[in-house]
Curated annotation (Swiss-Prot):
Residue pairs linked by disulfide bridges in the UniProt entry: none
Assembly, per entry: Homodimer.
Cofactor (UniProt): FAD
MF terms (GO), sorted A to Z: ferredoxin-NADP+ reductase activity; flavin adenine dinucleotide binding; NADP binding
Assigned protein family: Belongs to the ferredoxin--NADP reductase type 2 family.
Coiled coil ranges: none
Binding positions for FAD per the UniProt entry: D37, Q45, Y50, V90, F124, D286, T327
Cofactor binding, note field: Binds 1 FAD per subunit.
Protein name from the UniProt record: Ferredoxin--NADP reductase
Domain of life from the UniProt record: Bacteria
Species: Enterococcus faecalis (strain ATCC 700802 / V583)
Entries under InterPro entries matching the protein: FAD/NAD-bd_sf, FAD/NAD-binding_dom, Fd--NADP_Rdtase_type_2, Ferredoxin-NADP_redctase_2
HAMAP family listed in its UniProt record: FENR2 (MF_01685)
Keywords on record: FAD, Flavoprotein, NADP, Oxidoreductase
Amino acid sequence: MSDEKDIYDLTIIGGGPVGLFAAFYAGIRKAKTKIIDSLPQLGGQLTMLYPEKYIYDIPGFPAIKAGELIANLEKQMQPFQHDVCLEEEVTHLAQEADGLLRLDTTKGTHYSKTVIFAIGNGAFQPRRLAIENVEAFEGESIHYYVTDMKKFAGKKVAIAGGGDSAIDWALMLENVAEEVSIIHRRPQFRGHEHSVEQLEKSSVSIRTPYIISDILKENETFTGIQLTETKGDQTLDLPLDDLIINYGFTSSLTHLKEWGLDVSRNAINVHSDMSTNIPGVYAVGDICSYEGKVKLIATGFGEAPTAVNNALHYLRPDARRQPVHSTSLFENGVPK
């Protein structure tokens, strides 16, 4: 068994918005807490994929950028100085004979008395553009993540994809880039009706139904793409400075079953106290499932304190499940 100094009361797997709020709440409860995340920075998909997008269903915020929400959550958590392990993926979860939970990762081994999964839809990878030699331009002119819209200022940009995210990026870049095109392989988009209506009224050039069939280049420099009709032979050369691929993301959750967790429909089944079938292990946010579950960030914010309180009650049966209100725990914004 690891030395006592290496054992945490609570380890949160996942540093997205719900994981960050769980960490804040664990700080209020004075739990020795660690966050482990596979990404290079906290925030999950909100940071990696949509930092410039507005979120409209966070209580108290008529609209807030995803990146700003994450910055606020990090600031809220900061006073507790939790340990954070980034670019570290959990590869195995096991319960030791004494009940201690062992987490093997790509960088080492961690020990914790309780664990909360807050991994959203799991560790994710973008669906890449399936064209030969595309890797030569990825990260330069071909992008799967957009973290700063300003770099597209005055440029000719195309977004490939037919869902809400692709439409959102096209509309947001409309007032930034010189020209914006959106490419979809079907005649109709899969986005919400209101978003599609906004797109049709915008100056964004709609290229449907087309697929990207080739990359155009000159002296090994990206100059655009060739489009081919989905059902036909007509081709179209589209000069571009940048191409954003929004074909969605793949994630694998098969390892959760291998670890013994009760999983169905790509989610961990939990009880009303957010506990799983493994003692001391809890799940919150989009990764957890129960009857009537609604997948919203706001829902996860409610689940996080429930999981933390019950995890600490599991750890210390004399601990209160219903703690005192936060207003009595802070003075001038600083924990007492």
